[in-house]
Amino acid sequence: FEKRELRIKPGAYMQEEKLTNTGLPPQGQGRNGGYDGYIRHKLVVIAVLAVVVAGIAVLSMGMGALSLSAKDVVLALFGQGDARAVAAVQNIRLPRVLTAIVAGIALSLAGCAYQSVLRNPLASASTLGISQGAAFGASIAIIVLAGGGGSSAAYEGVSSADPVMTALLAFAGAMLSTVLILLLSRVREMTPESIVLLGVALSAVFTAGTTLVQYFAEDSQVAAVVFWTFGDLSRVNEDQLALMAIVTLVGAVVFHLNRWDFNAMESGEGLAHSLGISVSKVRLANMFVASAVASTVIAFCGIVNFVGLVAPHVMRRLLGSDYRYLLPASAIAGAGLLLVSDMLCHVIVAPLILPISAITSFVGAPVFIYLLFKGVNR
């Protein structure tokens, strides 16, 4: 790790020797010139990123069996133009795009919060066992509680189980992993590194439980569980999307209120304690909120890999670790990553639709590997 010296002077802004990891303004620059330029750079990056994501959303709504131009998409959003275009955009494509945006924002914010409070760049819903816990809960709903729907197709198997019950048990399984981590970490006062390792162990336990449940299931039920784990943005209805948006908004507000705590913890727990921050309370509270946000998305959309891991890393490279800007930038980047992945799902082997989790892994994993190799000397 890079040795950093933090200086705090009365009436001055916090400054560091280097910009490399924290994104704070370098020393030797005036308060107005250096700091204003530092802020302006980050705001410009976030604004450009938001415009790019908006363009991707319009492009996504124009792709499909009925190809539409950007102008046609905009007209259809306002109920004007060709009737077929209006129906396709408003009834099918817009809900899917909104789901991708909300889910991408939620997973990225959760991943950013995990990586901050645990001080571990590999912390995410997958490495903490949250995704695996959700899969275990969904398996119970589809296989045990559905009572053997006898469906002949995977998507029919998912629909034969009560979708509300499936979502509830998936959410319960995801939160069970979180509660176990929080309880065990409080009993033994685990370090952040140990908490991540505990999450990996719980992932193995939930995966084993899912395997055992599938072993005693019928073929159609196993196919239904596998189909659920693929992830699907199209199966989210309006009520579920609204709930996802509300939970995500609450999580975003909580993380925003804790942005200064995240910045202090980024410079070390010792400094955070000296500033009067209860590190353990901040860690546990934000882990719980992040898990609730991620679990809600996974419960409705299925497992979506790498979004919460890659988006914060990319934005940290561009903007540094100032969470005032890293949080919104990660949210926008996550939305863009999931939108691009959803587009690829629909165009690679059209008219077939590929699993969203596979595409996010294919897109996210190479980016993550590149970032690791690029920063290997730091």
PLM regions and their residue ranges:
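Polybasic, lysine-rich low-complexity intrinsically disordered segments
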Residues: 3-4
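Alpha-helical transmembrane segments in inner-membrane proteins
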Residues: 7-378
